[in-house]
Each structure stands twice: as C-alpha cells, then as structure tokens.
Amino acid sequence: MLFAARPARIRMDVVSPFGVALATLTSDGRQFALADLRDRTFYEGPASACNIARLTTVPVPGHVLVALLRGEAPVLRHEAVGPTMVWDKHGWWVLTIPSTRQAVEEIHLAPRPQDWQRPWDQQRMRVYDVRVTQQGYVLYHAELSDHAGAPTAGPREDPDNLEPPIPPSGPTCDAEVPRRIHVEVPVPEADVRFLYTQLSWNPPLPEGTFAQPVQPGMRVEHVICEE
C-alpha cells in the first residue's frame, strides 16, 4: 500500500502475499522512519534521499519520488527564459530545462490520444520520460507508461460505527496516472519499478499517516547518510 502527497510526504507498507506486514516507511518531508518488522529494527532520521532508499533502493529526494508516483515531472529550479520545447519525430514534445545549479532536465510530453485535435491550450498532457543530468552524468531517469484515469477515493468508514467517516483529502479528481513507473539511478546502479493495480486520488488521510510510533520490542537506530 502506498500514499503520496505533495510536496514530499510518503508512506509505503510492504505486505507479504499472506497479509503479514513486513515493513513500513513514512516520511513527512522532514523526518523519516522505517519499521523493518523482519529484524525488529526501527530506523529513524532525516528524510534524505539515501534514507528513503533504504526501502525504495533508489536515492532520489522525497519530492522527486512523490511527483513521479503521481505521474508528474519534478521540475528543476530555473530561470524563466531558460526552458525550450521542440517536437520530436517519435511523437512527443521534448521540454529541456537548464537549472540554476548546472543541471539539465529533459521531459518527454505528449497529449492524450483524444486531445490531439484540440487547440494546444486545451490539450491534457502525459509525462512519458524524465531525465536529469549534471555535468554530463545522469542523476536519475524515469519512464512512465500505461496512463489511465483514476477515480477519487470515497470516505473511510469506521467498521464499528464509533467514529464519523473520514472524508477524502481533496476535491473530486479523475486525472490520469501512469500504471507503470520505472526509476533508475545510475550511481549506485539502482532501479525500482512501481506497478499500480488499484489506485485513487485524494484518499482519506487519518492523522499520523506520514509518521509512525516505535512499536514495542523494536530496536531503534538513528541513521544519517551522505547525500
């Protein structure tokens, strides 16, 4: 199970095929926690890219991962006059963004199939590819595919009817989301693939969704790693 909310809040619950919880990662954008129930260790520390990679395996910043999981391109900080966009013969726009920190981002975009005949300012775009390089080295590369619309989540009901329902966390939305996302980080040769079989927009978010307490009997380890 996965929850991702802008700008950098994320929760991942790893469950075995038999329904047994194996690990839970939470990050509110500032603090990170990973409860590894297999070895009864609770890791906690700053929400750095390398800490989040303890579960995802790919060291990318939290806001980058959240954007990609939502089917969006995390845009580098840049000057207003810097970006350029050209049409590629393979059937997509190539948006190139030079950042203020000597990095370059390349984003591949294309309209939804049903929007090709619409005026350009009414076309809804799909993000297919994101690549960020710095001084000639690839920092990360993401491929997004199998785009389809997703519904808005309904309220979360208390099965015992003791508490009022928790409403969706946002307005009605049916935007598309890529069902397959592949993220690669050449150094240290890491990659991860996400496959959505069921998803919805703006699910109810109970208090504490992006944080977790230490469970009794777990060994606590404070972790700090180099970015």
Where are these regions (language model features)?
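An acidic-aromatic
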Residues: 5-64, 192
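Residue-level marker of positions within ordered structural domains that often coincide
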Residues: 17, 57, 70, 201, ...
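Flexible, processing/modification-adjacent segments and terminal tails
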Residues: 36-121
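Gly/Pro-enriched, hydrophobic low-complexity segments
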Residues: 82-217, 222-226
